[in-house]
Amino acid sequence: MTKHGAVVVPEDAVVAAAAVGRHFSFPPPRTGGVGGDSCKKLAAQQIDLGAAVIGSWLDSMKASSPRHRLVAPAVAAAAADAEHDEWMEKHPSALGKFEALAAAAKGKRIVVFLDYDGTLSPIVEDPDRAVMTDEMRDAVRGVAARFPTAIVSGRCRDKVLSFVGLEELYYAGSHGMDIQGPTNAAASKGGEEEEESVLCQPAREFLPMIGEAYAALVEKVEGVIPGAKVENNKFCLSVHFRRVDERRWGAVADQVRAVLRGYPRLRLTQGRKVLEVRPAIKWDKGEALRFLLSALGFSAAGDVEDDGDDDDAFPIYIGDDRTDEDAFRVLRARGHGAGILVSRFPKDTCASFSLRDPGEVKDFLRKLVTCAAA
């Protein structure tokens, strides 16, 4: 694989023909692509004030923590093995298929998108302790030296930057509502240059409202229900219930919904043992992926009629959460690109491939670096 080689997904998710790739400056020039004002207008045009009321929040919360079936061990093991084998046929290991994938589309430019929690770091009881290993950091650094690389997280952008510690990356915090370009050059100059590295904040007008909702949730949820933790991610809020007694999960959902009745322009979504409070705009990790591709000069939709001159990008998106499904769906709609779900267990997903855990993510990233250097 050359430095602008390609990885390809199965036939139902990829157009196999690959054109000769162009060379791109990295970081990309500020001209071209979609600007910050454009991203704000796009989000405002798609505002949806009636979005995202999931039928039963308690059932949804339980679904984020699947349990083994309470049946005879031998029967349970056989059923689980059969289910896993069937799922792996549809979502094979990205490591096991790597060589075939790497050889399938030489000419496209890889762009790497990575979730943080559960992808680059393990899921832990205390979200403030979700640190990545030095080995993972080295793997991400190696990938970023060869391909445009972005961290796309529900976390506050500054928080995930402090965890990752690599200024040469793009960071899309708050589920893509706070996007900043590489800050290594800007950080050395400070001031105006650092401000210029902010590419997109489509929900800036919601900041006062989110601050008020945060204070209310801390009082009504974190201050009342043992184990609950409310995290301010700047443009969204996370209500963690991983450490809450399951018998109180319903109370968590009820209290959160009670607070949000006073904020009809905020909506509630579900993650892995976390309730997410976001502005009611049509902006998510999938839209962040589109925006970043366009800002890099590629076609956001995957065709030559969109913002890019042609479509020689091959996006690889790796994530473990429900919120990453928005990005996986975008890759499916593009017709090519690799969506990779990080999970030990079968899940409904739009991803084409799978990896079991952050350890396998690290191995996959290292293989990308090795292939690019060959």
From Swiss-Prot:
Family according to the record: Belongs to the trehalose phosphatase family.
One Pfam family, short name: Trehalose_PPase
Enzyme Commission number(s): 3.1.3.12
Catalytic activity: alpha,alpha-trehalose 6-phosphate + H2O = alpha,alpha-trehalose + phosphate
NCBIfam families assigned to the protein according to its UniProt record, in alphabetical order: HAD-SF-IIB (TIGR01484), T6PP (TIGR00685)
Function: Removes the phosphate from trehalose 6-phosphate to produce free trehalose. Trehalose accumulation in plant may improve abiotic stress tolerance.
Name recorded for this polypeptide: Probable trehalose-phosphate phosphatase 9
Known pathway: Glycan biosynthesis; trehalose biosynthesis
Source organism of this protein record: Oryza sativa subsp. japonica (Rice)
